[in-house]
């Protein structure tokens, strides 16, 4: 039979586009709120981050603009406002004339739910992070992606795979309680351009295992190069 009370899978797409304007988000801050002008500024920055969701995906960190800002009165307050802003990413009604479901409205509603779920999941910390990261050398990256990696992951910027390694470590629990397991190219283990990243990982992380799978480690044509686990 079917198990009663089975929880829904915690799955979200991080590449959804924000439809609302930044002014719509900023309007969520009441005029009489403490530090209203500052909160509106932060919501505009957060909106700009989600506006890049189709390009950056799970590299997005909704709290990144707040982490180094001691003037923020309450991160929880901003997170609540962000949730309210994302909640506006839905149509007033899903039903058109003759009670026919409108495709555009339905898509917008699905986008809204995805943004809400993605924001919550990207703000979490996990005991186990497992993925096959995307591979893309810096020379082939979009300029916006280049700038983002340069600003936030300077030691890993030469390949998107290494950037995602850093992002996965961010998503893992602190104090050694989190484990990251990924598949990625193995050339960064010896190339000089990654020496700074290797050093900081050796100092700040515990390496449990690295397995060199080599060429054709997977049975698909795209895996015809050296990878590691």
Show where each model-derived region lies.
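Class I S-adenosyl-L-methionine-dependent methyltransferase module
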Residues: 1-124, 128
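Signature of N6-adenine DNA methyltransferases within the class I
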Residues: 1-28, 120-229
């Amino acid at each position: 039979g079917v198990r009663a009370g089975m929880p829904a899978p915690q799955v979200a797409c991080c590449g959804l586009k924000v439809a609302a304007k930044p002014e719509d988000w900023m309007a969520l801050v009441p005029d009489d709120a403490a530090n209203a002008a500052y909160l509106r500024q932060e919501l505009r920055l957060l909106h700009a981050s989600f506006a890049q969701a189709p390009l950056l995906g799970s590299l997005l960190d909704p709290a990144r603009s707040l982490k180094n800002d001691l003037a923020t009165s309450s991160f929880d307050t901003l997170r609540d406002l962000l949730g309210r802003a994302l909640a506006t990413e839905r149509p007033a009604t899903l039903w058109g004339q003759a009670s026919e479901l409108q495709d555009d409205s339905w898509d917008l509603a699905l986008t809204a739910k995805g943004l809400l779920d993605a924001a919550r999941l990207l703000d979490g910390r996990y005991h186990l992070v497992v993925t096959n990261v995307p591979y893309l050398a810096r020379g082939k990256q979009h300029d916006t992606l280049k700038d983002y990696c340069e600003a936030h992951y300077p030691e890993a910027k030469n390949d998107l795979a290494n950037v995602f390694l850093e992002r996965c470590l961010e998503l893992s629990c602190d104090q050694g309680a989190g484990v990251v397991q990924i598949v990625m190219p193995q050339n960064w283990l010896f190339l000089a351009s990654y020496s700074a990243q290797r050093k900081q990982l050796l100092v700040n992380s515990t390496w449990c295992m690295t397995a060199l799978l080599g060429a054709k480690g997977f049975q698909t044509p795209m895996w015809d190069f050296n990878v590691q686990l």
